[in-house]
Amino acid sequence: MRIGHGYDVHRFAEGDFVTLGGVRIPHRFGLLAHSDGDVLLHALCDALLGAAALGDIGRHFPDTDPRFKGVDSRVLLRHVVALVREKGWRVGNVDATIVAQAPKMAPHIERMRLSIAEDLQVGVEQVNVKATTTEKLGFTGREEGIAVHAVALLLAL
């Protein structure tokens, strides 16, 4: 059994939606990133990679590599799951906390869970996503960006 933690942040930029957990959410800003900016999936990738002692997302998908420009982060997550399996591990469960003042996450959480479960090849009951604000404190409270913490439990195949 292995446990990993992931954390990622993206700042807001020009745009009219954010993608979180593979779900497109209307918003008055987008997220600045080399890929599609799915900060939730990036944190999950790091948690999975960390649990398997495989480094981090930047090592596997560097933002200097043009192949990953604008890439759908679901593709990255699926690749990470394959790497983890090659090392003899399977996902036991994942849990993530989105830290954002806006947009409101509650209407989108279940679709995020379903999308993530599909990519992880696990049941939706093995995926938890929740959201909180910082009561208008810090960069997320000032609506400058979104942060996500994620943990993953891996079990031997």
Swiss-Prot record:
Where on this chain does 4-CDP-2-C-methyl-D-erythritol 2-phosphate bind? 8-10, 34-35, 56-58, 61-65, 100-106, 132-135, 139, 142
Which Gene3D superfamilies does the protein's record reference? 2-C-methyl-D-erythritol 2,4-cyclodiphosphate synthase (3.30.1330.50)
Task: Cite the cofactor comment.
Answer: Binds 1 divalent metal cation per subunit.
The lineage's top-level taxon is Bacteria
Site note Transition state stabilizer applies to H34, T133
Q: What class of enzyme is it?
A: lyase
Give TM segment ranges.
none
Molecular-function GO terms, alphabetical: 2-C-methyl-D-erythritol 2,4-cyclodiphosphate synthase activity; metal ion binding
E.C. no: 4.6.1.12
Reaction catalysis annotation: 4-CDP-2-C-methyl-D-erythritol 2-phosphate = 2-C-methyl-D-erythritol 2,4-cyclic diphosphate + CMP
Q: What does this protein do?
A: Involved in the biosynthesis of isopentenyl diphosphate (IPP) and dimethylallyl diphosphate (DMAPP), two major building blocks of isoprenoid compounds. Catalyzes the conversion of 4-diphosphocytidyl-2-C-methyl-D-erythritol 2-phosphate (CDP-ME2P) to 2-C-methyl-D-erythritol 2,4-cyclodiphosphate (ME-CPP) with a corresponding release of cytidine 5-monophosphate (CMP).
Output this protein's name. 2-C-methyl-D-erythritol 2,4-cyclodiphosphate synthase
Q: Which source organism does the UniProt entry give?
A: Azotobacter vinelandii (strain DJ / ATCC BAA-1303)
